[in-house]
From Swiss-Prot:
Binding site for substrate: 10-17, 23-24, 62, 89-92, 100, 116-117, 183-184
Keywords: Gluconeogenesis, Glycolysis, Isomerase
Superkingdom in the source lineage: Bacteria
PROSITE patterns given in the database record: PG_MUTASE
Protein name: 2,3-bisphosphoglycerate-dependent phosphoglycerate mutase
Pfam families attached to this UniProt entry: His_Phos_1 (PF00300)
Catalytic activity: (2R)-2-phosphoglycerate = (2R)-3-phosphoglycerate
Alphabetical list of InterPro entries matching this protein: His_Pase_superF_clade-1, His_PPase_superfam, PG/BPGM_mutase_AS, Phosphogly_mut1
Length: 248
């Protein structure tokens, strides 16, 4: 049987990526650059001959639009798209909407990095009546509890079981699956796929708009640990830019 493929695609640059704000579950749109990144992501899929048969994405427009733009560029606009909240970005709690550089200056490097990159320390909770709360957002009406904050461990807990149950079986059958999601939901997935430790995951940065392809064997194992970026040079530069967020 031919190996299946998982295509991990972080959404293109969003408005708050550009303004260096913590975004989380706030539903901001793509910038023009983000749209171009999504289009280029789809073109890279065509150039590599890696064409998805199904897409999984979040309930946030920056990921949904990235998927749609990439699929149009790859002439795969007709394939099924499944949207689920468990692919959402990590909820950044009371940090949502704050400028990253200003937050780092106010709280110091150590606290900033603990909130941003530690595995199991969430930021302070966001009040239900706060400006950027999702407590009354109709798209989350079926959730027993809408998150008020999350650490990366929380994202692993919500996303990985869904991946194991809904997405991985497709890849094990030889399908090619596009996962259009977010920096931290994809970090959670890569941690799982590559067995990255809780400490080492802090060093992993996912660039926007560049497909990362994992080959999956029939038994569900990863054939190419670490995955393969379809534009390695751009991916390295993009990851470095993500790591630098918070600096003026």
């Amino acid at each position: 049987m031919t190996n299946g493929k998982l295509i991990l695609l972080r959404h293109g640059q969003s408005e708050w990526n550009a303004s260096n704000q913590f975004t989380g579950w706030v539903d901001v749109n793509l910038t023009e650059q983000g749209e171009a990144e999504a289009k280029r992501g789809g073109e890279l899929l065509v150039e590599a001959g890696v064409l998805p048969g199904v897409v999984y994405t979040s309930l946030l427009r920056r990921a949904i639009r990235t998927a749609n733009i990439a699929l149009n560029a790859a002439d795969r606009h007709w394939i099924p798209v499944i949207r689920d909240w468990r692919l959402n970005e990590r909820h950044y709690g009371a940090l949502q909407g704050l400028d990253k550089a200003a937050t780092k200056e106010k709280y110091g490097d150590d606290q900033f990095m603990e909130w941003r990159r530690s595995y199991d320390t969430p930021p302070p909770e966001l009040a239900d009546d706060a400006e950027y709360s999702q407590a009354n957002d109709p798209r989350y009406a079926d959730l027993d509890v809408v998150p008020r904050t999350e650490c990366l461990k929380d994202v692993v807990v919500r996303f990985v079981p869904y991946f194991e149950e809904e997405i991985l079986p497709r890849a094990k059958k030889g399908e090619t699956v596009l996962i259009a999601a977010h920096g931290n939901s994809l970090r959670a997935l890569v941690k799982h796929l590559d067995g990255i430790s809780d400490a080492d995951i802090a060093e992993l940065n996912i660039p926007t708009g560049i497909p990362l392809v994992y080959e999956i064997a029939e038994d569900g194992s990863v054939v190419n640990p670490g995955g393969t970026y379809l534009d390695p040079e751009a991916a390295a530069a993009g990851a470095a830019a993500v790591a630098n967020q918070g600096n003026k």
